């Protein structure tokens, strides 16, 4: 082994934050410096030339300090005995560069901690705990410790539990020590089963049974029988959910039997490459919609980043593994936590009840968890388009007396939708001898016992077991797996997949038995064929670990050659680990130890111990009245705007890519000022249609503290009023996912759960004609701990989170909260609460530390159905200019958010609504269902008539009107009872987000964004074009029939190739899918092409720098280098690099004539991934792609973490002077800017695209290919029809080729 120092691992900003963290534990620490250390394991010597290549490979990131840093060394490295995902990718890159003498490269971080006195062993331990993740990393105080990275561990043997000698007691002890979470009747069942088999169980079999039969996996409570007040109930909880399908399952193609539900979609052209020719094309067919929503609550409480990240990853795998292979498309995320208690910003309703040591604080969850969820989606390439965020923690009355209710065990929701072919919805039969395959990453000792651990109340397990049950993520690997699945489903009837499942809770021990059971077979497996990056693991650890990014599948023997080709091209690892058998038995042999860790009849593993039976008695309690009549309106309004469920969610949104796929039509950000106020997400079905899909969420959990069934009805109602903004043909087109969280067994909670499921499943949804074809439950929502002598607990309210999905008729007709001030208009409230104005469970009650006695409710489902039909009709007729539903914070919040989205003011009059001023608070802040619509004055009567004809005449109230003057006034009897400037109101609403952003990211950037809210004159996004957006300058060339081929180039981890291909296809090119493996193998030569586009994503997961690993595998591979150099030097070629492709090509500048002065692109100034819509100016440059566009200013999608052009002031000025700069960021006034977020990455002079001297090679960080359609722009001028402004760039390319 030898080591090589690398770049600084932390920016000055991150270093300062870390120092403050460490000083809380060790005040004597004065400095900290961190740099990467690389460790290289060789099986032969490197030549001098190879050593140079290695040195250059490991030079990435910012410049480090040359002298050795001083201070105590904390060397953080991957846990010895494991191979990190970073190592696998870096070693692959090294091998691609011809460095085959390298066995492995591994990376650690050397932290040098300077202190005023020698650190004690206790202090060292405390600092080490801050610096590393003990699940996946180790800490050494000497470099030599890293030698252990390459040591070879001997496998550990299995053990058995001696029940033949010690009986049931032996199993009960194993249950406790192994954290199996077996119920008493399950212990009896297993004791009996193995006694009958005449042998002792192995530890592997016990863990496998525990995972397969955990509450997490088998949903025992939802399948239980119930007795209430002595009366046996006729339905289980699951039976009541299924009732919605039995009553109205039309257009549901798959429910309750697969990883996700499938519902009917519309027709369109699915755009993908032909397997044989690799040319992209449209395949017109039914594009059905799949829907899934998961929770990952337990892991997120323990380790928020990893918990949320793997939660998203697991849900994405569920979608991909639907039917016999499907395509995930768009994601949603939600969080519910206890009070944030932001330092220096503590709110009047926030107390400090404490928490157990083993879980992190609500604040830490919300600083780290959302980044984890967003990072996985970003790297995988799935846009995150909607969600929710709620905090709740309060001492309230219940059947148990006064007790603390809240979310110390958080809710982390990961969900989404995708598409699937009609012929792939049903899984196929598994043939005897079919190959059983693990696709994806290797086994590692992470996430052990996650299914069982998440089934226990938080605090009931041992802390080490808690931590061991959290998985770790590798999204780039999952992307590779999905590419293989994509290649399979794109083959249509020749799809080689017979059956597929994702690997989740319980690891292979759950996934493989489930695969063969569902396929009607048994399975014979060889343990040592499981890919394993941790050779020292025991059989239990190999079989049961929850390493992520894995799928299991069955492939017929005759299709293995095809499947192998697909995997090799995508560089996706797979292994045949067994074969399907006629005998219904699971047998796992272990050739290393020559034994069988598992040898069980399927009937034992899946045979059920007695079904759970739950007996409850109804109880009641006195609910104190919440009196709002004496409240100060101004104080109440400001408190509500600061409550996280109401406040701006910007800090949760801009971290997530919302443009990838090029099919996003409506994300959270609305209008020219990109206000985070949309409650519905809308995507197009493909690039050739206006049909699409919509999704939205609904949840009103605090209501459950006083009226659980109401909370369920209100959650469903909110999802519907959110979805109503999209153009959906009929209410029954909406299908719901229901995620149920409860503290089962806690007094009153079983009754709350049963009654709410009944209200939703047996009553409300059947009345509305709506089906719930998918869902999830988490039944252990209670945290218990000891503080001194005191026993403490925090119990979550019953929590139903609804996610609604529907096909959309026309994505162009999605309504938003942005108002149109071009003609006089009125704002109308449609009040589905019938003037009852109930305040129980409201934001108003919460900010005054109350919960109230009477909750809002959906009293009349027929009225909700009529409301939905009216909104759809009026939208179709063009009578509605804006729409926003009423929810958290009441109509006050609804109106404020409409003003923020429109950068305008409004005058609202309550004269017709309240006679007595003391009732204004109830009118303003009640959270009854409803919506506010903006209607032109000329259409007000027609709109009222429409609602009257639907029986809703008494529910429509004219509230007032919007106006350009930015004052927001609420008036009663001629007096302003509440008045603000729009800017002042918006800053109150945005401050919670700003504070979180300041703590998490570069605080200077957060402050600049916050300050920009004040600018009343900010014109917002605009499009000032020097060309006609609707002119097709490529038409004459397309009409000749010639379609020049363009290489749409990708590397492993790239995720934006489809939209790039679609844009060039529309411009008259024949887009060819080319993987770097095609070039390196010699299967494809660039000499055959005149055009190349390098796409965005995360090649190699950004290992060795963003785009740098990809570039170096070209620079240091003779075949690839020669091809790229020749291509760049030919005068008849052009190339475009976008985002990751830009980062890659900029690192190839030594091969490109006239690119000497190009910058590299490094970490954003904000220190955060930035997903924005930014204004750019097209500069006068020789870029052949931007000819005729100079002087134009228009919006463009931005989504990257490393886009800052690394060039000094002189270098930047020189690039400008030489006309090598093609695009630069400008603010909304059209001025070049350094200010955040108008310059999202902080590049000097706003530089975000450069070209070479002759203009043939252009690279840019923003994404024109994602917004080539007008409908794919988050905001667009109304004059645009089909084409967006950036389509001209692709047509310029076609014109240049002639």
UniProtKB/Swiss-Prot annotation:
UniProt-listed GO biological process terms: 'de novo' IMP biosynthetic process
Catalysed conversion reaction: N(2)-formyl-N(1)-(5-phospho-beta-D-ribosyl)glycinamide + L-glutamine + ATP + H2O = 2-formamido-N(1)-(5-O-phospho-beta-D-ribosyl)acetamidine + L-glutamate + ADP + phosphate + H(+)
Pathway(s) served: Purine metabolism; IMP biosynthesis via de novo pathway; 5-amino-1-(5-phospho-D-ribosyl)imidazole from N(2)-formyl-N(1)-(5-phospho-D-ribosyl)glycinamide: step 1/2
Residues that, per the record, bind Mg(2+): 679, 718, 722, 885
Keyword Cell membrane among UniProt keywords: no
Sequence positions that bind ATP: 307-318, 887
Main location: cytoplasm
Top-rank EC class of the record's enzyme: ligase
Compartments where found: Cytoplasm
Quaternary assembly: Monomer.
Family matches, as NCBIfam families: FGAM_synt, PRK05297.1
Role description: Phosphoribosylformylglycinamidine synthase involved in the purines biosynthetic pathway. Catalyzes the ATP-dependent conversion of formylglycinamide ribonucleotide (FGAR) and glutamine to yield formylglycinamidine ribonucleotide (FGAM) and glutamate.
Protein name: Phosphoribosylformylglycinamidine synthase
Classification of source organism: Bacteria, Pseudomonadati, Pseudomonadota, Gammaproteobacteria, Oceanospirillales
